[in-house]
Amino acid sequence: MAYSYTEKKRIRKDFGKLPQVMDVPYLLAIQLDSYFDFLQQDRAIEERLDVGLHAAFKSVFPIESFSGNAALEYVSYRFGTPAFDVKECQLRGVTYSAPLRVKVRLIIYDKDSSTKAIKDIKEQEVYMGEIPLMTENGTFVVNGTERVIVSQLHRSPGVFFDHDKGKSHSSGKLLYSARIIPYRGSWLDFEFDPKDNVYVRIDRRRKLPATVLLRALGMSAEEILETFFDTSTFHIEKSGFSVELVPSRLRGETATFDIKDGEGNLIVEEGRRITQKHIRQMEKAGLERLDVPMEYLFGKTLAKDQVDPNTGELVCECNTEITPELLEKIGQAGITTLETLYTNDLDTGPFVSDTLKIDTTHSQLEALVEIYRMMRPGEPPTKEAAETLFHNLFFTEDRYDLSGVGRMKFNRRLRREGDTGSGVLDNQDILDVMRELINIRNGFGEVDDIDHLGNRRIRCVGEMAENQFRVGLVRVERAVKERLSMAESEGLMPQDLINAKPVAAAVKEFFGSSQLSQFMDQNNPLSEVTHKRRVSALGPGGLTRERAGFEVRDVHATHYGRLCPIETLEGPNIGLINSLATYSHTNSYGFLETPYRKVVDRQVTDEVVHLSAIEEGDFIIAQASATVDESNKLTDDLVQVRHKGETTFMAPDKVTLMDVSPRQVVSVAAALIPFLEHDDANRALMGSNMQRQAVPTLKAEKPLVGTGMERFVARDSGVCAVARRGGVIDSVDAKRIVVRINEDEIIGGEAGVDIYNLTKYVRSNQNTCMNQRPIVRPGDVVARGDILADGPSVDMGDLALGQNMRMAFMPWNGYNFEDSILISERVVEEDRFTSIHIQELTCVSRDTKLGAEEISSDIPNVGEAALGKLDDAGIVYIGAEVGAGDILVGKVTPKGETQLTPEEKLLRAIFGEKASDVKDTSLRAPTGMKGTVIDVQVFTRDGVEKDSRALSIEQSQLDEVRKDLQETYRIAEEATFERLKRALIGQPVNGGPKLKKGDTLDEAYLDELPRSQWFKLRMQDESLNELLAQADEQLENRRKEMDERFEDKKRKLTQGDDLAPGVLKIVKVYLAVKRRIQSGDKMAGRHGNKGVISSIMPIEDMPFDDNGEPVDVVLNPLGVPSRMNVGQILETHLGMAANGLGVKIDRMLRDARQQQVAEIRDFLGQVYNTAETRQEDIDSLSDDEIITLAKNLRSGVPVATPVFDGAKEHEIKHLLTLADLPDSGQMTLYDGRTGDAFDRQVTVGYMYMLKLNHLVDDKMHARSTGSYSLVTQQPLGGKAQFGGQRFGEMEVWALEAYGAAYTLQEMLTVKSDDVEGRTKMYKNIVDGDHSMQAGMPESFNVLVKEIRSLGIDIELEG
């Protein structure tokens, strides 16, 4: 087994029993693939698929002028290079985007020609705005901040049949409906009312009888009836009436007369129900016609118009009910055959016939006018307008599009052949939908389940961006059409016709302010990954949380392997915002697919198929944990399977598919919870959500008990530096890693060096600190995909959100009441949960009406001490320690001219006029903040002179760039000469400095030869001469490239910044704040066990064991039983064993080296290779690697217990025994204060604890004086507004109950909204007089005004 660089250093013991059939896929693929398809940037123009931008252009172009004499065609598009890279965009606060240039062709036709001959063709590239680019980690940088576009789960286009569940009508009758939902265009609904008439609605407007729509399609009443009904044929003869018999139609009816066969034998007696047996007798007797009494025809409905055969006169219309009078009339007219509609109450209702009777329209025109009136009430209809409107609704591609997925769903639901077809509707589509609806009402067929994932699809970022782009293009199209008519006469070029602003505005609006474009959650790597894999049912075209019912939010059987049943938000959005399951991805139609292994005749194969919820229904699917023998055959007599949404047991030979992995059910965050199978789902939900809120600690520590998913999240999150190609580490420092590439991975003409510049102390969106630390050393060999540097919350390539803490589950003096957590002082001393938070503070200098604001250290009325940390430019030094109220950037603002007294005038005349006409508006550190300045950025408007600080920052950045480029060149040069040296040594030469023909080159000569002279060597081997020439050219090109890059960077740095109007200068100060853990901070485990720290106890007071080892954290045992998250107990036991093994290895490491290696190798074999678990190849490691591994295991042997395939109880006990610990997992603890043993043994072990981003420093806040509400004059609320604590109604009752009248008066007046009283009080306090005089609260005045506004006069007396 080959181990990666990091795996070799610290192997995680895996308790998984099931084989790893399929690796965890790339977790961000859903974002990157979707946006790649949208841009198709790297695809050749001729290979571009009909999706994304290409499809948007093709759907809008060609644009023809109104006259048809000119047209604008789309040819192709390309992207320019972005003006700034990602880091520069974040720094400058601009969007990371590339210019889109579209090649269009203007064709002008000859007006006079009858064949539309082409008169002129002009082709030109047109700029169509900036398109935001996705970073390699699946995010967008919009206005300097990283954002994520969340995928949307919406109703798939197609046709859906449903009923109202009996809620609409008091009788509880089910009213069936059908809805055709297009991707773009008007919705079409058919619905039954309680009287069983069929109605149609367009875009949920007023309903019309459905036959109005059919008439508008050009159908007559006869055609409508013929389409929806079978007919019965009656013959009128002199002897009486007879009907052409279809025996099966009589089944279930009651005979109203005797039915006899041809020989007069009685088959069915009058009054008897006709059964299947009777029908067989009729068929046997060969009855074709049946004589019926006249009364049998009464009440039947005519299927055709009845015309007098002699005169051609209409006797009666179709859909007329037969009465004795009508029958007589028909008889007189000499009509011999009648066709009536076949209906019955059981399974062939007269719905369309009844609807026709209430339909007031009689012709196509009337129907079109009726539809026009419904769509455009109040507008006078004309024939043309009505026809155009109706045609545009469903039958033109510009206004209506079912899309490929909609047509596929439509055809499959109506059981048609083929999945493709037109994007617009036709008559047959509408008739088929009505027919299916009527069949469902008649009891044939089922309604659809809208929550089935076969009826909901994912709209990813690329698709949403395409739709938005198309919206912009359609706006452009209107303007272009108007200008095209002038194109010929004025000789315009394509550039003059197209205004790109609407497109740019539409795209900008989507990325900047769409509900689904969200500020990225960047607390830790997991929160980034989860945010990108999130699926929301909210957003444009989706649900609203107010309207979403319980069914939409609930877990559905089809979520299995597609959406996580556990991870969703708590609160009003529960169930509406979900997370993708681990192995889930979307197919070309946008439906979620999950992988399965094929099973053939009990044999489980390694062939993997990906199925959507629609395709999965017909298969019988076993779980991944189904028992198989050595040859991968299912062994059980009955296997637990899923089939059509139900879980059941079946014989193994019926099984067709099997799950790929037990973790395929859950999302990434839930798959990180060990022993998830032992936790209640509600607590697991909290656990997976709280992992996303964990703050990266100063030193990340891998979890002792993990699930094996940790390295996949770290790998795909993008926070680590990952080797792009394999090679040897050349040099490493804190900021840069240089890798010399393997020969076989070098692409021709390259230097063979990869340089990784690391992220150092950068602020994340959540103000946490992003920092990368190298984990490689010079000389290490790395392969492609190996982790070179850990990011925040990553430890040696493993996700590490928290710290392993020594736990005890016991009550301790009430300090762990109600989920409170008691921790030891040692945790604070060792900085286990210390985190760094970076605050960005901004000072903006504007151009005001009274003059420009100035950033300077010359600030009026401020002492020297306050200016001590500022430089000459008035900006704080890097490294300065600042506290609340300290000046960070000195700024003065011009003040309005005030009337001066003669004395002031005299002073101004003597001392100059600077001091009094400016006021101090400096940027100060906010209250409650204390930290160190780690960076300062100065942005200056183009044309404004840069200050000394801006120039020094610019110079230091240029020096950094120069150093970087020189280093790159040096390494490239060395690598090139190293390659040349290897090729040249021992080779004969034709000539060269101090060489004769035939000499062979040796190492000593080459070492002495100046490098500039190497290229003068002439070798006998011509290929070596080519190699030398090639190397010389490459180095020259590289030198030029470096110069160009430096000049480019210099130009970017020295040019002015593009700032908002009126802004002259922006100074950004970055403060690093160190937050130690303290009382009031929120902590949690991974099982939903959260709590607030109640107290931090001295180490000596904490409970300790027989070895004198104190515990770090004391948790309340009552937090476990009612919450049903037993996983935390199992984690604690297994963590104890893992730590115990580490202690044992530590003891071994202290022995002599020789015995040590053998003993450690043997012990590691015992630890890793137990009978049932996955085997690790310890023998493949060298002695040095074994020692390195053992050293890394000192703090504990990390274990993986995959979800639903984790460690069993006996395995945990085995490890505890191996670590020489009691297998009960409990031990005697002693009270640290008294030294007495506690009454009973206590569960002690190691649990992984997280510090959540709910820190008491961010919440704690106290107001002295501050701003007041405008109307009520009461203090504002909340920390952001520097508000007060609300003294509400109930608090008033409390003071009333205590009888504390004066305290209550103070609260309601001077401390709240008595304006005069509080001003007076302030003055009194300043003067040292602590008395108060309460006045009238302002809110009382507001109340009086409110009452007066209602017309009630209210006055105050006295």
From Swiss-Prot:
Its EC number is 2.7.7.6. One of its GO terms (molecular function) is DNA binding. One of its GO terms (cellular component) is DNA-directed RNA polymerase complex. The keyword Cell division does not apply. It is an enzyme of class 2 (transferase). It holds the Pfam family RNA_pol_Rpb2_45. The keyword Cell cycle does not apply. One of its GO terms (biological process) is DNA-templated transcription. CDD domains: RNA_pol_B_RPB2. It comes from the Bacteria. Keywords: DNA-directed RNA polymerase, Nucleotidyltransferase, Transcription, Transferase. It catalyses: RNA(n) + a ribonucleoside 5'-triphosphate = RNA(n+1) + diphosphate. InterPro entries: DNA-dir_RNA_pol_bsu_ext_1_sf, DNA-dir_RNA_pol_bsu_external_1, DNA-dir_RNA_pol_su2, DNA-dir_RNAP_su2_dom, DNA-dir_RNAP_su2_hyb_sf, RNA_pol_bsu_bac, RNA_pol_bsu_CS, RNA_pol_bsu_protrusion. The RNAP catalytic core consists of 2 alpha, 1 beta, 1 beta' and 1 omega subunit. When a sigma factor is associated with the core the holoenzyme is formed, which can initiate transcription. Belongs to the RNA polymerase beta chain family. DNA-dependent RNA polymerase catalyzes the transcription of DNA into RNA using the four ribonucleoside triphosphates as substrates. NCBIfam families: PRK00405.1 (NF001616), rpoB (TIGR02013). PANTHER family: DNA-DIRECTED RNA POLYMERASE I SUBUNIT 2 (PTHR20856). This is DNA-directed RNA polymerase subunit beta. The gene is rpoB.
